[in-house]
């Protein structure tokens, strides 16, 4: 995985122009190299590597929800099969808009940025699996470009005219979080109020359904009895008045 996953990144059209200028510089230096020693040629190649080192830096944009994802026309979150080789990734036919696959069960989400029709950026976890769904700590980038190629054996990067040469370099750098690939966070299930729950437990204990039903009936009877007694107490003074008035009438 470590060898096949070594990629190099190319920035968008702005970087392509800077790359072409590097290529022009390299071609203009060729006559001097033919006259001078091989050592000087090697130093020129190292200078070229230093000049394009800035193009190897890439930073992902944060994508928080599927709605934000739709707004970002050049940023796509996709899932790739585990153990996919660099060559297989470079042969991906993404077209103008890669398909977005969102699955909640898998936390490993990869970000593809399409720089042009022939340039695709892929962020992958490193060989130790040093990757979380919120932050890519170390990533790999692969891009196809006709302008620069890297000699994997020597590590020297030189301009080339060959079309769509895959460049591979291991990028040891930090990326910004890409956020949640699933969408808006799901609301936690509402738990019953602790007070009500405790009160029910205190009242019921380990009682069976029948016992609870009987208790309920008894409570209803007690309530009815209490209401009757209250009513009787309220009606007692009225009854006394009625008795007194009836006695007066008889007299």
Swiss-Prot record:
The lineage of its organism: Eukaryota, Fungi, Dikarya, Ascomycota, Taphrinomycotina. It is found in: Nucleus, Nucleolus. InterPro entries: DNA-dir_RNA_pol1_su_RPA34. One of its GO terms (biological process) is transcription by RNA polymerase I. Residues 23-32, 190-201, 212-237 have a biased composition (Basic and acidic residues). Residues 34-46 have a biased composition (Polar residues). Keywords: DNA-directed RNA polymerase, Nucleus, Phosphoprotein, Transcription. It comes from Schizosaccharomyces pombe (strain 972 / ATCC 24843) (Fission yeast). GO terms for cellular component: nucleus; RNA polymerase I complex. Residues 1-66, 163-251 are annotated as: Disordered. The keyword Hydrolase does not apply. DNA-dependent RNA polymerase catalyzes the transcription of DNA into RNA using the four ribonucleoside triphosphates as substrates. Component of RNA polymerase I which synthesizes ribosomal RNA precursors. Residues 8-17 have a biased composition (Acidic residues). Residues 238-251 have a biased composition (Basic residues). This is DNA-directed RNA polymerase I subunit rpa34. Belongs to the eukaryotic RPA34 RNA polymerase subunit family.
């Amino acid at each position: 995985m470590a060898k096949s996953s070594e990629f190099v990144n190319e920035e968008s059209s702005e970087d392509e122009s800077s790359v072409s200028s590097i290529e022009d510089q390299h071609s203009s230096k060729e006559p001097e190299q033919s006259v001078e020693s091989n050592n000087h040629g090697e130093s020129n190649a190292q200078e070229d590597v230093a000049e394009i080192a800035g193009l190897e830096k890439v930073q992902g944009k944060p994508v928080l929800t599927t709605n934000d994802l739709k707004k970002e026309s050049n940023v796509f979150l996709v899932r790739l099969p585990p153990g996919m080789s660099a060559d297989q990734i470079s042969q991906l036919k993404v077209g103008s808009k890669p398909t977005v696959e969102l699955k909640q069960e898998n936390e490993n989400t990869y970000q593809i940025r399409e720089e042009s029709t022939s340039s695709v950026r892929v962020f992958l976890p490193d060989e130790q699996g040093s990757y979380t769904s919120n932050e890519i700590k170390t990533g790999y980038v692969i891009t196809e470009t006709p302008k620069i190629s890297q000699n994997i054996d020597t590590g020297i990067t030189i301009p080339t005219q060959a079309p769509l040469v895959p460049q591979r370099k291991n990028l040891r750098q930090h990326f910004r979080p890409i956020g949640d690939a699933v969408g808006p966070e799901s609301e936690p299930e509402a738990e019953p109020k602790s007070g009500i729950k405790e009160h029910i437990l205190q009242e019921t204990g380990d009682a069976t359904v029948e016992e609870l039903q009987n208790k309920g009936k008894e409570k209803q009877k007690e309530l009815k009895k209490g209401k009757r007694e209250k009513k009787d107490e309220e009606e007692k003074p009225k009854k006394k008045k009625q008795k007194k008035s009836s006695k007066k009438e008889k007299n």
